[in-house]
């Protein structure tokens, strides 16, 4: 009838009548009133007729600005009616309170018990809120490209482009977004709460946990390793069953694609029971006491509100098939870093042939998902400082990916420190030049020099100093593909005095730069020291000999090179060696470190030299030396012909 009355007003405006004429109760024609059988009452003004009392339904307002309407049957309680609506949104009745909204005075609400008969509330409006003392945190997702090695917390697969919660650090793929738990634990706030056990009210007005729970959580946190206590370390506490939250009410004003998670939006919030938090913090510890929760009463939760009807066991059950042995123990997520996935169990690697021994370790050929090279380092009983420094360097080595670099595959720490790299079938450059005396052509020697400079340029771009650049560590793989190995690992190539790292001359004498031999600086190793070693390799390529072959005394070589009295004899370079290569060898072997070029300049010089080399193009008129197969079957008699008579 209101629409009809509005229509009459519209018509009246067309005839210049006043709107006040139609405002009274008698403005409608009696004919219209009789036809519709409806007469407007003063009590109906501004109120839509409520049909909920006749349809046995209750309107419920839920957290996160959601609402629903539930059907009521006889004998059902509020818990029974609202259980499904709460479950699909990832909520628990034990962490919520239900209120009945009172019309007068407006905004007042009366708390109800979950066991209240729902039939007595038909037609009423209810509101479900979180309990005030429930520690509540919401997700804050942001799109992120993980430049460092990362794995999805849901599918445990490699993660490059995905999302991460800025609060708890939970990271996942886009296609795994539907499985992200709704609970978000801000561990920095929890630890801040644990630091003040005597405060009853926090800054946000949230009551603190009871002393018993505080003490247990504080004991658990005290056992957390320091390495895992950072703001984004989040253990795998999402072990409870949560349904996927409905998309209704979770999108922004501009509806987005359902295949993309909402970025910078608060997800459906899951209240955090302190029992879950206590179990989560206990997961951080490797040696958590199994009876940490045995003293909790069964009828009350640690925070004081009533527990679910199902009693909670005092000790969490182990998953079937779990083993207490250390090798099968699954580490908590908060304790894992990306290096964990690169550690190889010693029992998985089978060593076979001993390849050789060097200054820093022994190399073996082994089997680990195929042929690998295992270098067992000469580090006996590493100190915690050495072990941590070794892990830091491994974190750098595992990021190296280049065609001219030996592929790093993992490391081992049990019994001895060892690194595992790809296996190179070819021999080292040293063996080719000085043992087998392989005869390379000049363009092949220049290409080997180019590939070596290319690999070293990559390492220096990664801020990795080789420290032991020599022909023994350059391998020719599957033909003439250069592979550089044994790079980095300053921890192994240095001497330790207690917990302090002391630099010492490392590498072979013939390839050591003069400043490294002198050891006058605190850290003589630099990009230029690698360039000097590379210059010695160029000298080997262009002469086929080792430098200082006329000096047989090792100490004399150290003294003369360190003082600058001796340098490689460049007159022994091959006669057909290009002049540009001769200049490059001389520049790399400069006695003053600052005068040596860096590898970007070296690489560009060699590439320019390669392009300038003369190439003999095949003549177009030259016949092919490879005859077709059918020509071999031609009989010589077919080529003879009868002599024709001459007229």
UniProtKB/Swiss-Prot annotation:
Residues 349-609 form the Protein kinase domain. The modification Phosphoserine is found at residues 43, 259, 338, 499, 621. ATP binds at residues 355-363, 375. The modification Phosphothreonine is found at residue 268. It is found in: Cytoplasm; Cell membrane. Its main location: cytoplasm. InterPro entries: C1-like_sf (IPR046349), DAG/PE-bd (IPR020454), Kinase-like_dom_sf (IPR011009), PE/DAG-bd (IPR002219), Prot_kinase_dom (IPR000719), Protein_kinase_ATP_BS (IPR017441), RBD_dom (IPR003116), Ser/Thr_kinase_AS (IPR008271). GO terms for biological process: death-inducing signaling complex assembly; ERBB2-ERBB3 signaling pathway; extrinsic apoptotic signaling pathway via death domain receptors; face development; insulin receptor signaling pathway; insulin secretion involved in cellular response to glucose stimulus; insulin-like growth factor receptor signaling pathway; intermediate filament cytoskeleton organization. Residues 236-269, 284-334 are annotated as: Disordered. It is an enzyme of class 2 (transferase). Residues 239-269, 298-309 have a biased composition (Polar residues). GO terms for cellular component: cytoplasm; cytosol; Golgi apparatus; mitochondrion; plasma membrane; pseudopodium. Phosphorylation at Ser-259 inactivates kinase activity. Dephosphorylation of Ser-259 by a complex containing protein phosphatase 1 relieves inactivation, leading to stimulate RAF1 activity. This is RAF proto-oncogene serine/threonine-protein kinase.
């Amino acid at each position: 009838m209101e629409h009809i009355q509005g229509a009459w007003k519209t018509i009246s405006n067309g005839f210049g009548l006043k709107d006040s004429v139609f405002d009274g109760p008698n403005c409608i024609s009696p004919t219209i009133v009789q036809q519709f059988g409806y007469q407007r009452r003063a009590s109906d003004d501004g109120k839509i007729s409520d049909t909920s009392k006749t349809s046995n339904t209750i309107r419920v307002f839920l957290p996160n600005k959601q609402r629903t309407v539930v059907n009521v049957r006889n004998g059902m309680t509020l818990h029974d009616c609202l259980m499904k609506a709460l479950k699909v949104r990832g909520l628990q009745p034990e962490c919520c309170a239900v209120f009945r909204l009172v019309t007068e005075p407006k905004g007042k609400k009366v708390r109800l018990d979950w066991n209240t008969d729902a039939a007595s509330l038909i037609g009423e409006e209810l509101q479900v809120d979180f309990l005030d003392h429930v520690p509540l945190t919401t997700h804050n997702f942001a799109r992120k490209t993980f430049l460092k090695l990362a794995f999805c917390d849901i599918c445990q697969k490699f993660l490059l482009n995905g999302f991460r919660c800025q609060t708890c650090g939970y990271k996942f793929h886009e296609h795994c977004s539907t499985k992200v738990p709704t609970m978000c634990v801000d561990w920095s706030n929890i630890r801040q709460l644990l630091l003040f056990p005597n405060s009853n009210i926090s800054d946000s007005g949230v009551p603190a946990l009871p002393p018993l729970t505080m003490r247990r959580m504080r004991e658990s946190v005290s056992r957390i390793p320091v390495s895992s206590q950072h703001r984004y370390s989040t253990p795998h506490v999402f072990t409870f069953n949560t349904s996927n939250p409905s998309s209704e009410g979770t999108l922004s004003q501009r509806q987005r694609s359902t295949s993309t998670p909402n970025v910078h939006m608060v997800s459906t919030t899951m209240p955090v029971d302190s029992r879950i938090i206590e179990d989560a913090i206990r997961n951080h510890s490797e040696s958590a006491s199994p009876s940490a929760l045995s003293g909790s009463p069964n009828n009350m939760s640690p925070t004081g509100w009533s527990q679910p009807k199902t009693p909670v066991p005092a000790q969490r059950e182990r998953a079937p098939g779990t083993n207490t042995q250390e090798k099968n123990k699954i580490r908590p997520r908060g304790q894992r870093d990306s290096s964990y996935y690169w550690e190889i169990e010693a029992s998985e690697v089978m060593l076979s042939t001993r390849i050789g021994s060097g200054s820093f370790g022994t190399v073996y050929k082994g089997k680990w998902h195929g042929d690998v090279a295992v270098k067992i380092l000469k580090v006996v009983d590493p100190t915690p400082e050495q072990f941590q420094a070794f892990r830091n360097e491994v974190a750098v080595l595992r990021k190296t990916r280049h065609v001219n670099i030996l592929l790093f595959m993992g490391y081992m720490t049990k019994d001895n420190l060892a690194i595992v790299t790809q296996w190179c079938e070819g021999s080292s450059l040293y063996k080719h030049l000085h043992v087998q005396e392989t005869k390379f052509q000049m363009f092949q020697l220049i290409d080997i020099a180019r590939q070596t400079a290319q690999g070293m340029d990559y390492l220096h771009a990664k801020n990795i100093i080789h420290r032991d650049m020599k022909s023994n560590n350059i391998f020719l793989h599957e033909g003439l593909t250069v592979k550089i190995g044994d790079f980095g690992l300053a921890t192994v190539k240095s001497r330790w005095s207690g917990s302090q790292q002391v630099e010492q001359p490392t590498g072979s004498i013939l390839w050591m730069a003069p400043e490294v031999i002198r050891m006058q600086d605190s850290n003589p190793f630099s990009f230029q020291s690698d360039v000097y070693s590379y210059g010695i390799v160029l000298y080997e390529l262009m002469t086929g000999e080792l430098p200082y072959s006329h000096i047989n005394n090792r100490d004399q070589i150290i003294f003369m090179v360190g003082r600058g009295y001796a340098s490689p004899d460049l007159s022994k370079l091959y006669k057909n060696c290009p002049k540009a290569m001769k200049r490059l060898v001389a520049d790399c072997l400069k006695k003053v470190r600052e005068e040596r070029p860096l590898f970007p300049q070296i690489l560009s010089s060699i590439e320019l030299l390669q392009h300038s080399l003369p190439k003999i193009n095949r003549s177009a008129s030259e016949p092919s030396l490879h005859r077709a197969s059918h020509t071999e079957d031609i009989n010589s008699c077919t080529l003879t012909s009868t002599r024709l008579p001459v007229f």
